[in-house]
Amino acid sequence: MGMVEVVGLVLHPRRDCGSAIRAITGWAEERGVTVLGLPAEVSRINHCTAVAVEAEEMVQRAGLLVSLGGDGTMLRTMRLVEGRKTPVLGVNVGRLGFLAEVDLPALGEALSAIDEHRYTVESRTAVRTVLPDGREVSAFNDIALVRVPGHGLAAVGIRVEGRGFVNYAADAVIVSTPTGSTAYSFSAGGPIVSPNVEALIVSAAAAHSSFNRSLVLDTSEQLALEVLPSSGRLAIEVDGIIEGHAEPGARLEIRPAPGAAQVIRFGRTSFYERARRKLRVEGSAQAGALDATDVVVVDSFERERYEVLLGGEVAGFLRYRRDAGRLELLHTEIDQAFSGRGLASRLAAAALADARSRATPVTASCPFVMGYLERHPENES
């Protein structure tokens, strides 16, 4: 990357990024660098001098994108520049993540390193598929076929090189990149895979079949997922966001895209150091007790789920569906690094309190929430 003339900013939707933006715009003004941002994001920052442009223009003009937030913001930034050589600098504003390279206090030093070309660029693989409605989607973490409560298990056939290998019956079947191997795939028992490896990982969450092992495939091998006749209706999640549904008989061709995004690294910490810290591989005692003031539950209505936040980062969620004036609580998922901390109970309590405040009847198909209601019958509608 030569001298940067235009920098694009992508911001966390809720977190205060004002100090980071001021540091970047100050650095840019000294060098005659133009700073661009998305209209809805920069408009909420007081005295922001970044120029508001639409995403397509920002991606075309920027020689560097800076992601200010956590892993979710970083994934969104990577999807914006998918297939381009534009490098992405991840600045962590909140709890430790895997993808961001620097924390906010080190931003000034990082900008100086970019000035002096003291960095490397790491390629990241994406995974792509075409949805049943014809839309092509991409993910840098994973694409998952997830059971819809009330519609039966996810019965999915795995075909490699055109031949059937195994049929899974599970709550979800996940195809992840090495980047995503520490996300949903990890919580399903999948392996941790170095981002330097070009591979796809297939894992089953809560498998009900006799075969429950993960598969690691080379990116040159053809992979397809077939929704079997015995399957229920499945949600198609792309980096954790529901993008569509698959009925029995549907087939998803999964295609890897090596080198789909370029991430800036300064060599301060390795992938394995970040993994050790976030996943608490030395045991839960290392993590310490959670301060109740650090735990926040929010209603992420656009994703149809309640999210529990630790230091502003999503540590778990409770998916729901609102239908005919009722709230149906579907299933919970908690980050493996924070299992055993009572976060699922906090989600259930917050969801039920929210329903009471709205005088909304509640039903639950999530086994955990059903058990919570049995223990706390005063919350049941």
Where are these regions (language model features)?
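ATP/NTP phosphate-donor binding region
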Residues: 1-64, 105-120, 131-137
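Catalytic core of DAGKc-family lipid kinases
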Residues: 96-172
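ATP/nucleoside-binding phosphotransfer catalytic cores, i.e., glycine-rich phosphate-binding loops
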Residues: 132, 145, 150, 161-164, ...
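Conserved beta-hairpin
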Residues: 304-315
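A short, internal acetyl-CoA/4′-phosphopantetheine-binding micro-motif in the GNAT/acyltransferase core
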Residues: 332-339
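Conserved acetyl-CoA-binding loop-helix of GNAT-fold acetyltransferases
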Residues: 340-353
